[in-house]
């Protein structure tokens, strides 16, 4: 295959849509149309973006080509399938916040889920690292505390880019007045926000953040790990915070069973990090890199298992200096 040129730097790019109308229209369709029709509309929207959004198409091909070169189990490059899967996930994300996935539709793997639930029942908080692989909205199942064995309401603080998530939050508030999302802007981490994070942990809550993207305002600081056989930059701040709060840390993934069908069936994976955290400034860089390496190892495992549920549509291997394979 012809070599794909390095993509534009995406750090600092603004949200593509500045309107809440697409979210509200999707909600209206979910409320009034049968599922088969919503499926059809979703596929049409995915095809439209696949044809007219060159960057989305090329970055999907770049990722799948790298995966094919790295993995012995992935052999077919299907960028349209990945874009369609992403479109379905967006629809299900809106559906999840207005109509939570029934507990019986979520399959918990035999991993560290029980350890996390037991820890929360003991009033001990945790630091959760997610990614843009799969659908992290499955975490909302924790709200169904009686069904999974959690005996109390768990406070959850989400670290996210408010410039990107603000329109989604506004739309959800209009569609569901019970919608509440305690967010902390990753682009404005101060001593006050760190104190807020610590308070959430000390109250037995969860602090959730994505470990696979750089902060747009702190993109010059990053950790380097090999991902699918090539060096890639990973968030510095997420792993710094994990070591700073020194709380038990878990990697969480939620995946749809079936790539391009609105079926609301999910599988949830919870993996407790083994890296030793805390201990002050001495050795912090080593601990951060150890945690990041552990996360990337799991990310590589799951990306081969669910290859079309990868939702980073940019040059993932580009460093802030505009080069790939930076040292």
Regions found by a protein language model. Give the residues of each.
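Short, flexible loop segments at the rims of nucleotide/cofactor-binding pockets, characterized by
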Residues: 102-108, 182-188, 227-229, 281
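A generic secondary-structure micro-motif detector
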Residues: 15-16, 50, 162, 187, ...
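Catalytic core of membrane glycerolipid acyltransferases/transacylases, capturing the structured
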Residues: 120-188, 217-223
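Membrane-anchoring hydrophobic helices of lipid-metabolizing enzymes
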Residues: 2-135, 171-174
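Soluble or luminal CAZymes and related metallo-dependent hydrolases
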Residues: 21, 56, 108, 189, ...
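Residue-level marker for well-ordered alpha-helical positions
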Residues: 58, 114, 137, 169-170, ...
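Non-catalytic C-terminal accessory region of glycerolipid acyltransferases
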Residues: 145, 174, 178, 191-327
């Amino acid at each position: 295959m012809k070599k794909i040129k390095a993509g534009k730097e995406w750090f600092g790019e603004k949200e593509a849509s500045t309107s809440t109308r697409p979210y509200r229209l999707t909600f209206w369709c979910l409320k009034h149309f049968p599922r088969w029709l919503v499926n059809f509309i979703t596929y049409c929207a995915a095809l439209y973006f696949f044809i007219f959004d060159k960057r989305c198409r090329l970055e999907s091909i770049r990722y799948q080509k790298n995966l094919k070169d790295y993995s012995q189990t992935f052999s077919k490059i299907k960028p349209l399938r990945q874009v369609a899967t992403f479109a379905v996930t967006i629809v299900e994300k809106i559906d999840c916040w207005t109509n939570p996935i029934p507990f019986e539709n979520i399959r918990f793997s035999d991993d560290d889920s029980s350890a996390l639930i037991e820890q929360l029942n003991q009033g001990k908080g945790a630091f959760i690292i997610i990614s843009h692989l799969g659908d992290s909205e499955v975490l909302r199942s924790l709200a169904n505390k009686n069904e999974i064995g959690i005996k109390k309401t768990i406070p959850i603080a989400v670290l996210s880019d408010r410039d990107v998530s603000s329109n989604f939050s506004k739309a959800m508030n209009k569609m569901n007045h019970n919608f509440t999302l305690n967010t902390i802007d990753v682009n404005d981490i101060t001593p006050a926000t760190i104190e807020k994070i610590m308070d959430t942990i000390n109250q037995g809550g969860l602090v959730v953040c994505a470990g696979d993207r750089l902060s747009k305002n702190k993109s010059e600081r990053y950790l380097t790990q090999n991902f699918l056989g090539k060096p890639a930059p990973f968030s510095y701040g997420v792993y710094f915070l994990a070591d700073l709060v020194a709380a038990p840390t878990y990697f969480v993934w939620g995946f749809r069973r079936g790539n391009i069908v609105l079926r609301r069936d999910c599988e949830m994976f919870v993996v407790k990090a083994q890296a030793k955290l805390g201990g002050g400034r001495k050795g912090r860089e080593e601990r951060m890199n150890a945690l990041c390496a552990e996360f990337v190892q799991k990310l590589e495992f799951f990306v081969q298992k669910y290859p079309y549920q990868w939702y980073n549509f940019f040059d993932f291997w580009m460093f802030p200096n505009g080069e790939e394979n930076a040292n």
